[in-house]
Amino acid sequence: MLTRRPLLAAPLLLPAAAHAQKRPARPAKKEVPPVGIPATTPLGPIDTMAKYALVMDYNTGAVMLDKEGSTSMPPSSMTKLMTAYIVYSHLKTGRMSLMQELPVSERAWRMQGSKMFVPLNGSVRVEDLIRGVIVQSGNDACIVLAEAIAGSEEGFVELMNGKARELGLTNSYFRNSTGWPDPAQRMTCRDIATLARRLITDFPEYYKYDAEKTYKYGGIEQQNRNPLVQKGIADGLKTGHTDEGGYGLVASASRAGRRVIVVVNGLNTMHQRAEESERLLEWSYREFENVNLFNAGDTIEQARVWLGTAPRVALVGGQDVWITMPRSWRRTAKITVMFPEPVTAPVTRGDVLGKLVLSGQGVPTTEVPLLAGADVPRLGLPGRAAAVVSRFVTGS
């Protein structure tokens, strides 16, 4: 029989730790899917003049706004996030060092567009080149790094496309390391947000460069091109602009322990880019919150066990579960625990026995697995016989 038990009602939607009993032992580790509001579901009533836009919660991966977020578009200099990712990977694995000097080829020196102004036939430290890429959006710095890592920019592009596949960026394809206009070079807002999230997660030690407001190299001081970094609203990542793609930006900010990633593209002016990205960021903090449903090991419910050495088994959380939700959902959301009852022994700690369901009017249904919190061996033959007789006599 399937048991459904309401766990809490909308006005009381609080972190579920208040409703759960903590067990001293955690369940056996099982693969549990990540939890968040389905990414295709629009969560809030807001529009934007950006042709493409996506707003993502960094912690849960929930998408609060999706406007053509999966539509292919020119990424412009937001491409440089992938260049940075590969450079950081080489630093983290010891294949490159921050103090290492890299040679400047004529091709790098001649590169057009935004520049760091690397010296022809000279050499530049890797750390300076990183700042040149992130702060100054230097196309020349990208070429120096690409040639040092892969021997040529063409070889580096192969690494970029391979890394895109590895990271699950299913709608990204690169032809260069800089974002220089090329009709075949494409990304989506979703892929850019995913890449930004991975950059911050995988390389927190290098994310600090994004927050630098100015950088001076070769006697030339340049401002960080990210307007939200300049205003102290965001702490990274990257702007972009081409004639085809318009003005774009991927930015991230953290407030009170909650980080948000905003991607916009296809705007007409730098002012629109700054205004829209700031407006969407403020909206995401004003209208949404992260709620802790339960933590790994919390007991959510108890299920009766048939033919087991214990009469009940705890249904526990397999991981810490947070969801991103509009603040208005507190009035309509409800949580229900669903599980078959009785559960037939034997039960192994970590078995998936049920699920917690978040639902309600205007609330996308979200399901979270619940696991067995303990082993419950099967009774021996005499015990099973006694249980069958008892059930026949008492009907329970």
Q: Which residue ranges define each predicted feature?
A:
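Sec/Tat signal peptide C-region and signal peptidase I cleavage site
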Residues: 16-20
